[in-house]
Amino acid sequence: MVPYIHRVHYYETDRMGVTHHSNYVRMMEEARVDFMEQLGWPYAKMEELGVMSPVTAVNLKYLAPTTFDDRIAIQVRVRAFDGVRLTIGYTMTKMGDAPVTVLTGESEHVFLNAQGRFVRMKREMPEFFQLLMEMAGAEQA
């Protein structure tokens, strides 16, 4: 997968001149949306099928600061999938002559229908289910 590139905007920085911590969750979402498009399962397609994928947990480890105009490469991968819960992993690296990993994190998701019930992925979305299982298996191998 091609990493998602985010350029830090001035409004994302705080009084100390560094990227405010809350913006990293937004960057994760931007990268996840791009990742899903690269997989051929954009969120718009899932919503057309009546499937939503809410975030149920987020975990971040800040390793180094970023500042205005930094470019951050965000590598996204499927960390785990058990047929119900999907864990997405993120590694953010500040680009430049000496790239620096600035954040590692995870977000956990489930798949729900319009009534808020769990989607039976294996039965209702078998191609997507298989893709996620393969990607999770590759991560754990």
Q: Could you say what each language-model-derived stretch is?
A:
Residues I5-H9, K61, V110:
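Generic structural detector for well-ordered beta-strands
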Residues M1-F35:
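Catalytic strand-loop segment that frames the active site of acyl-thioester-processing enzymes
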Residues H6, E12-D14, P42, V51, ...:
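Glycine-rich, flexible loop/turn motifs
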Residues E12, M16-H21, E29, M46, ...:
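Anionic, Ser/Thr-rich low-complexity intrinsically disordered regions
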Residues V2-Y4, E37, T67-F68, R79-A141:
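HotDog/MaoC-like acyl-thioester-processing domains
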Residues F35-A80, R85-L86, V100-T104:
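Hydrophobic beta-strand-centered segment that forms part of the acyl-chain substrate-binding groove
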